[in-house]
Amino acid sequence: MSRQAALADLQSKVGAEPGVGGWFSVSQELINGFADVTLDHQWIHVDVERTARESPFGAPVAHGFFTLSLIPHLTGMVEPDKPQYPGIALTVNYGLNRVRFPHPLLAGSRIRAHTQLRSVEEVRGNGLQMIHNVTVEVEGVEKPTCVAEMVSRLYFDED
């Protein structure tokens, strides 16, 4: 598919009903692994016993950046064997706008992402830039654990 065909298709989806991903379980092991990689071992994230005693949440809380790092997986954008549009050379995470964490994400929770395309435009280098509104929901919790505008770019082999 050409960049122009993808642009036309994406423009028709701007503002459409949000897509909803599948549920994903957030284990303490995943949180601990993220703490190891980022060198952020604050007790509120990794100390199960202490959080049970001293935290207002009663359980470890995942790092906000942990939640952000899961957005490509939660939105299904990381599927190299199933490209959204044939002809894409690569997809780039270009950044995030307006990130907030309205509710803590506790170890043992299940989350999923709601994604709505907000805008799409052409960019140099045979690419398209998209902005998606992303809301990460926690099962059984009214407030989301994360809301953000995700900026990504698609670059095509040819036009």
In which residue ranges do the predicted regions lie?
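HotDog/MaoC-like acyl-thioester-processing domains
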Residues: M1-G15, G19, F101-D159
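A beta-strand/beta-hairpin structural motif
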Residues: Y94-R98
